[in-house]
Structures are given as structure tokens and as C-alpha cells.
């Protein structure tokens, strides 16, 4: 139902010009309230030598990962590619949703689904592929959950001239077959994970031939694949600092766009590893850390994967097989059996180390929802605003609606900004299951933290 308003409400979006694409990424490392704990070598439990990572990652990405420079220049070629794929992305006001909810809150959203691949993931995919190409790397290997990251890297490889191989979590591989097709259109090889390609995959399939997979397992497979080919390197879609830094183009654009409207009181995003949440929030968090502003930051996760709300802040592996360095983060344990929810991009046992620090200091507050209440919110949003959110992004939508209803109860004109990180047009199986009453909610009664290693110096 369309709820008509006044002529003043016609101004309900902000679209920047190509020349306003940010020229620098924001690196939060020098502004964190405490130094980031170093990654540990899994063989020695000592701080890892960055040189050891060059067999896995492109060298420039390792440099960015540990850089203390607050701002890092975006290469001209990457900015040109950003313009090609749909940056800057629009910022909208959800006026019809506000009226349907009868809330005094004002709701704005940054729409990353406007990119050609349909999500925020292309922001770091282009950067990672660009640096890999410059270093003579021939092939990139990665994991993907819902397929958004795999799609983004597949297109980046096609645009820049790199081969791409994707290990897609088995549950999503079968839930979202059109994602696989899209990746293949862009020229990528796509395998369900666990797969028969790697020893890691074979081991998990022996344990359970119908294993739904997880991002942790897919990461293990991708790394094993990379270690077998000198010309290949690994690309990661979330968690690490350089990935989150590339995503700050979202928040840097949004900071310009909100000036056309008003400053937010609350900033909300969904969280799996943390990249889309960080992309929007980190430029605003900088103002809080500098004492220049006050915002409330809400990070939303599935109750089936309660990393932030029930996890432990300690050192753990970033993958399921223990091939990666150990990083200090909120974790459910790298052996946690992740239920096959439709939000495939949120099926990860850990959390970005930088976001973990901010959460540990109370700067970011976590929330968790079941997938049925998430899809309920997504359907309402689609009817109100016409955009079908990705199941991952719909977690943020659920929190936004609840925050707007809270403002209604309190009679407060709360200004809410959230990241609608992707559209759900290739995720309609989840919506079908919701509409037909087939969705299952999962909530772990026992968390498997037995494999979360805790070195003597861990807090």
C-alpha cells in the first residue's frame, strides 16, 4: 500500500556524482581504543612474521593489513572501476516504511544493492584483484557463503584479467543455484564446499556426506588450493582489516549524503565477518573516537550463529581446518557446526578483529534474531520500499523496524541510518520457504568452544 505524503517528501534520496567517489580508504587501526592483538603463527603460537603470509595473500594487501596510516590512497584505476560498477551508491529515505510503522523515527539507508553485482562485496573485490594483477598473480581462489562475495570476485577477475575459483558453502550452493550461474557467466569455476577437490573437503565429507558446509570450511579449502599453486593467491571477503578498510567507501560516501538530510542517531548493519557493517560505520566511529560526535552502533547477527551475543573473545583460527593464523576475535570456535540458515553470508564462526575490539569496549552493541522474524521484516520492507533485501541485509532491516517501533513507543524522533548491503533477487528460495511456512529457526543449546585455542597471553 502506498502512503502518500507532502511535496516536501519528494526529496527522499541522495545521489553523488562520479567525481565524489572517495579518493582514500579509511583505516581504523590507528584510532582503535587499544592496539590490535597480533595474529599468531599456528605452528609456534608466536606473533606471525608478515613475510609468511605472502604465500597466501598479495603483498600489498599484507602491507595494508598492518598499516598504521589512517588513510590509504585508492588507485585511480580502482576508482574508475568503482564508477563502472555503480559507485557512488544512492542513499534513500524509507518514507513509506516510516508511515506504515506510524513512527516519528526517520529511516535512511545506504543501498549497496545498486552495484552491478547486487551487493557491497565488489568494493574490496576490485581492489584485491587490482593488486593481485599488479604482482603477476594469475589466479585468485576464495570462499563464498550466499554467493555475493564469489560473484563480486568473479566479475573483478573478468574485468581485470584473472582466473577465479570459488568454494561455495554447500547449503547455499543448492539453495541459491542462480548465484553459481552468475559466477560462471563471469568466468569463474565454482565448487560446493566441502568438495572432493581438497583433503580438507574430503575429510568433512567422510564425516558427513550431506555436510551443509560453512564459511570456515570453504576458507580452508581455498587456502589448501592456493598452497598447491605458486601462481595463485587467496582473496578474503570479510574479517581482515584490509577488507573492511576497502569497504569504508560506503561510510565515506554516506557522511557526505547525510548532510543533505540530517545526522543519524543510530547506525545499523548486519554482521557475519563484519565488512558491510564496518564499511558504513567506521567513518562515523572515527568521529566518536575523536570525541566529535555521539552515535549508537548496532550490529545484527543470526541467533543460529551468535558470535557476538554468545561467543568468547579469544584467539582462534579463521578457518575450520586450522590452516590460517590465529586471530583474536569473538568466536564460537572454529569447529562450530553452523546451521544451514538462508543468510549464507552470516554463517561464520568468528568476527573481524577490529570490530571485536570495538565491541569489547562497548562502542558497538550486538543484537540477534531468528530467520523467521528477519524474513517477516524483509517482506514488510519490500512491500513498503519496493526493494527485496538479501537475507543477510534483512537482519539489519529487522533491527531498524524494532528501533523505529521503540521510537514510536517513546515518542522520540530517532534518526536511523542502516546499510542495505545487497538485494535478494537471487535469494528467493528463502522467501518462498518463509511465505509457505517452511522456515526453521535454529538456536544452539550448546556452543562448541572446545577447539577455540587460548594462548597463555590471551585475555
UniProtKB/Swiss-Prot annotation:
Record keywords, A-Z: Amino-acid biosynthesis, Aromatic amino acid biosynthesis, Lyase, Pyridoxal phosphate, Tryptophan biosynthesis
Catalysis: reaction(s): (1S,2R)-1-C-(indol-3-yl)glycerol 3-phosphate + L-serine = D-glyceraldehyde 3-phosphate + L-tryptophan + H2O
SUPFAM superfamilies, A to Z: Tryptophan synthase beta subunit-like PLP-dependent enzymes
Gene3D superfamilies, per database record: 3.40.50.1100
Listed pathway(s): Amino-acid biosynthesis; L-tryptophan biosynthesis; L-tryptophan from chorismate: step 5/5
Cofactor(s) demanded: pyridoxal 5'-phosphate
Superkingdom of origin: Archaea
Matches recorded under Pfam families: PALP
Stored InterPro entries: Trp_synth_b-like (IPR006316), Trp_synth_b_CS (IPR006653), Trp_synth_beta (IPR006654), Trp_synth_beta/beta-like (IPR023026), TrpB-like_PALP (IPR001926), TrpB-like_PALP_sf (IPR036052)
Signal peptide: none
One cellular component (GO) term of this entry: cytoplasm
N6-(pyridoxal phosphate)lysine modification, residue list: 121
UniProt enzyme class: lyase
Gene Ontology molecular functions: L-serine hydro-lyase (adding indole, L-tryptophan-forming) activity; pyridoxal phosphate binding; tryptophan synthase activity
Enzyme Commission identifier(s): 4.2.1.20
Disulphide bond pairs: none
Assembly notes: Tetramer of two alpha and two beta chains.
Family label: Belongs to the TrpB family.
HAMAP family in alphabetical order: Trp_synth_beta (MF_00133)
Job of this protein: The beta subunit is responsible for the synthesis of L-tryptophan from indole and L-serine.
Protein name: Tryptophan synthase beta chain
Originating organism: Pyrococcus horikoshii (strain ATCC 700860 / DSM 12428 / JCM 9974 / NBRC 100139 / OT-3)
